[in-house]
From Swiss-Prot:
This is (E)-nerolidol synthase TPS18VF. (2E,6E)-farnesyl diphosphate binds at R276, D313, D317, R455, D458. Mg(2+) 3 binds at D458, S462, E466. Binds 3 Mg(2+) or Mn(2+) ions per subunit. Highly expressed in glandular trichomes. Belongs to the terpene synthase family. Tpsb subfamily. Pfam families: Terpene_synth (PF01397), Terpene_synth_C (PF03936). Its EC number is 4.2.3.-, 4.2.3.26, 4.2.3.25. One of its GO terms (molecular function) is magnesium ion binding. GO terms for biological process: diterpenoid biosynthetic process. It is an enzyme of class 4 (lyase). Involved in sesquiterpene olefins biosynthesis, constituants of cannabinoids and terpenoids-rich resins. Catalyzes primarily the conversion of (2E)-farnesyl diphosphate to (E)-nerolidol, and the conversion of (2E)-geranyl diphosphate to (+)linalool and (-)linalool. The keyword Metal-binding applies.
Length: 554
């Protein structure tokens, strides 16, 4: 392999200035000299003409160089919703087919690994399929593996590692890329620590939180200030990101106030004293899934549905007899008020509040569309309760199902199906029709893959919320009884399945079904991205990382 294929960053100092970085520094300098962008005390953006200057910089950027780096910076800072039109034009100017053909026929091997991997990642993220074969030219033909000389190119390895997380099933070369890049980045840490703690921290952070599987909502604040990233444009857009962070933070606080008042007003916290009372935590799911500030009403409405998933889960896990759970499930399947007459008052209250919430969501769509999603929403909630009931019967009879059977039911009992169906309805995109809703209702792979990620992460440590009692099954328990393996064997199998589920989810988001609008795809990805934070319990059954993020955001 010719040496010219490697990045010009052939040293263990990964962010050595280059012509590309100098270009970004010149743009930043020119922007600062011509703009008086600042933050008002109330957090508003001022003036509008300065926001237009940001857009103008993006419009004038070379789409094959600075434009892509700017998009990367904007996405990392979590302000891509401001520049949707400009980003779309830059991405559309790229041709995945042309990109591949040009690379395939280039016999000089001069492409920089960082640039190629960045372009590959951004095109795939925006629904343009680029074959993973483009990375074959970075392999040693004699050995059949990635050229070990690339280990010197820390910047390129970081970009390759980021790109590898958009792998779909059967792309062995991206599996190899992930292993190769991670191995050599980890090996570089000792040398990096000697002369630049910031750069070492950046590599460690990337290894732990690759962009595609992270939420910029939680990571963007770490980029504020002088950040030693490979992308100099982060410093250009961070002032705007700070303004937006403050503005959106105020919006989130207002939404939490609405959610907590609604939760108090419906009285379930007093009626169901055994159930979790965590409206802020429930809101975090909505905040993470629906990131565009304009979706304020949708976040509040989604949090209401999520609260019932938690409450009903606690009813099935901790409170009721099996006979009562059967009656409750029958009531949710028929939606007849006569079916709840024999239930305790607390379960009657829950049923009525759930029915009111579903009717409210359906009526909103009916007013806009002239048809109601009521039947679909009710059917989805009935499926959830039926899955909860299956688990309750397993526990009552001391039956431990086969691992496959447990996971198939667990995909439904995870509640992901309910959340994503509600999101699909709440987004109210032009693609929302009874036909597309029927399709989403019937558990397409974008839902089952996301649900598998949540169910397996939830079971990985078999932890519960602080102070929560009750009984739950676990994939670990089912696997060990069926196959006789150890806890470590079960967890290794679970991580493999999580990896496979991510590949399936990636495929759905890259090879896009017209039935799924981009905001729905993004919400599905964001749900999967939040899962590790929501289930990363410590030995005290607390979520310290999530609590830290909540404090910084709210």
């Amino acid at each position: 392999m010719a040496l010219s294929i490697m990045s010009s960053y052939a040293s263990f100092r990964p962010f050595k200035p280059s012509s590309s970085l100098s270009s970004s520094q010149n743009i930043i300098r020119n922007f600062d000299e011509n703009s008086k962008y600042h933050i008002r005390s109330n957090g508003d953006l001022t003036p509008q003409k300065d926001l237009d200057k940001y857009r103008d910089v993006l419009r004038k950027a070379d789409p094959f160089d600075e434009g892509l780096k700017m998009i990367d910076a904007i996405q990392r800072l979590g302000i891509d919703y401001i520049f949707e039109e400009e980003i779309d034009k830059i991405i559309q100017s790229q041709s995945a087919y042309k990109f591949f053909r040009e690379f395939e026929h280039d016999h000089h091997h001069h492409q920089d690994l960082y640039d190629v991997a960045l372009r590959f990642r951004l095109l795939r993220q925006h629904g343009h399929f680029v074959p993973a074969d483009i990375f074959n030219k970075y392999k040693d033909n004699n050995k059949g593996c990635f050229d070990t000389r690339l280990r010197e190119d820390i910047k390129g390895l970081l970009s390759l590692y980021e790109a590898s997380h958009l792998c779909i099933e059967g792309e062995n070369i991206l599996d190899e890329a992930a292993l190769f890049s991670a191995q050599h980045l980890e090996a570089s840490m000792t040398r990096l620590h000697r002369y630049d703690q910031y750069q070492a921290k950046y590599v460690a952070t990337t290894l732990q939180n690759p962009t595609h599987k992270s939420l910029s909502k939680f990571t963007a604040k770490d980029l504020f200030g002088v950040y030693p990233s490979e992308n100099g444009y982060i410093n250009l857009f961070q002032q705007l990101a700070k303004v937006e962070f403050n503005r959106v933070q105020s919006l989130h606080r207002m939404e939490i106030d609405k959610v907590t008042r609604w939760w108090r007003d419906i009285g379930l916290a007093k009626e169901l004293t055994f159930a979790r009372d965590q409206p802020v935590k429930w809101y975090i799911w909505s905040m993470a899934c629906l990131t565009d500030p304009i979706l304020s009403k949708q976040r509040v409405a989604l949090t209401k549905s999520i609260s019932f998933i938690y409450v009903i889960d606690d009813i099935f896990d901790m409170y009721s007899s099996l006979d009562e759970l059967i009656l409750f499930t029958q009531a949710v399947s028929s939606w007849e008020y006569s079916a709840i007459e024999k239930l305790p008052d607390s379960m009657k209250t829950c049923f009525k509040a759930l029915d009111n919430m579903i009717n409210e969501s359906s009526h909103t769509i009916y007013q806009k569309r002239g048809w109601s999603p009521l039947h679909s929403l009710r059917k989805t909630w009935a499926s959830l309760c039926e899955a909860f009931l299956v688990e309750a019967k397993w526990f009552a009879s001391r039956h431990v199902p086969k691992a496959k059977e447990y996971l198939e039911n667990g995909v439904v009992s995870s509640g992901v199906h309910v959340v994503l169906v509600h999101i699909f309805v709440l987004l109210d995109e032009t693609s929302l029709t009874q036909k597309t809703l029927d399709f989403v209702e019937n558990m397409p792979s974008i839902i089952t893959s996301t649900a598998s990620i949540l169910r397996l992460w939830d079971d990985f440590g078999s932890a519960k919320d602080e102070n929560q009692e009750g009984h739950d099954g676990s994939y670990v328990e089912c696997y060990m009884k069926e196959l006789g393996g150890s806890v470590e064997d079960a967890r290794e199998e679970m991580m493999e399945k999580i990896s496979d589920a991510w590949k399936c989810l990636n495929k759905e988001c890259i090879l896009r079904n017209p039935a799924f609008p981009p905001p729905f795809l993004k919400a599905s990805l964001n749900l999967a991205r939040l899962v590790p934070l929501m289930y990363n319990y410590d030995h005290n059954q607390r979520l310290p990382h999530l609590e830290e993020h909540i404090k910084s955001l709210l």
